[in-house]
Amino acid sequence: MHRHYNGLKTVLLLGGMWVVLLAIGWAIAGATRNSAFIMIFAVVGLLGTAYSYWNSDKLAIRSMRAVPVTPQQAPAMYRIVHELSQAAGQPMPRLFIAPTMSPNAFATGRNPEHAAVCCTEGILQLLDERELRGVLGHELMHVYNRDILTSSVAAAVAGIITSAAQMLQFAAIFGGGRGNDNRGGNPLVGLLLALLAPLAATVIQLAISRTREYDADEDGSKLTGDPLALASALRKIEGGASQFPMDPEDQKVVNTSHLMIANPFRGGAVTGLFRTHPATADRIARLENMARAGGGNPAGR
């Protein structure tokens, strides 16, 4: 039930982002009396989405300064991923370790054949093998569910909306009131849209990210057959991230943070609509309910 609801919610949220983008395009066309800008943004959006999607693994791994690892360097990580990928009938992803004590993990890649899973040094030291299995099951399901495509589209459209809103603000100020022709519309409406559209795009993008996390929690726990292992891991990761947070001033890390299993930055100042991840307490409660209901089918154990 949750899975179908979350899938529909993701589609509706992506649709909402395109509605915002079209509204900006309509406003720019009215303010400048030139509809060519709509086509320009559409082409740029498609190219940006394609580049981000095709190179998602390289961009994310590079941003975390991660290095590839062998079975000898990370035997537990390698063995768990090998077992789970075999149980899921999927190819083995490439494995990386990021040199930071902040406990976290993420998966990236445009499809299972070009996937990568990265753990930080901190998470490998913090979790026991059962908890690590829960985390890796979660990350593998992001790849199998094609979440990278969803997040790439959302990020690209959000970026285009921000750029388009800046252009709309300029057009509304300098181009909205020329002559006696009122076809350009009210410049105040354009200014209001220019200010609110990027905020709306960000809220929608973050809502999509939170929705995909819930799905990966559920599907990953079904793959491992152990929802409580992931619940225990999330509890430890939240505490570890508070003790060893990542740098919020590092833009590359910020751009990758939505891929991570938990918020890598300290504190809970950002709440509600502006969370990159669902509240850890909510995720743990769902996993505990899943365990009580007997959810999960043990795999590769």
Swiss-Prot record:
Annotated TM spans: 11-31, 34-54, 154-174, 188-208
Annotated keywords: Cell membrane, Hydrolase, Membrane, Metal-binding, Metalloprotease, Protease, Transmembrane, Transmembrane helix, Zinc
Residues at the active site: 139
EC number per UniProt: 3.4.24.-
Disulfide cross-links: none
Broad class of the protein's primary localization: membrane
GO MF, one annotated term: zinc ion binding
Gene Ontology cellular component terms for the protein in this record: plasma membrane
Gene Ontology annotations of biological process type: proteolysis
Record: residues binding Zn(2+): 138, 142, 213
Cell compartment(s), UniProt: Cell membrane
Membrane topology according to the record: Multi-pass membrane protein
Cofactor mode of binding and number, as noted: Binds 1 zinc ion per subunit.
Known cofactor(s): Zn(2+)
Family, as annotated: Belongs to the peptidase M48B family.
Name the UniProt record assigns to this protein: Protease HtpX homolog
Organism whose genome encodes this protein: Kocuria rhizophila (strain ATCC 9341 / DSM 348 / NBRC 103217 / DC2201)
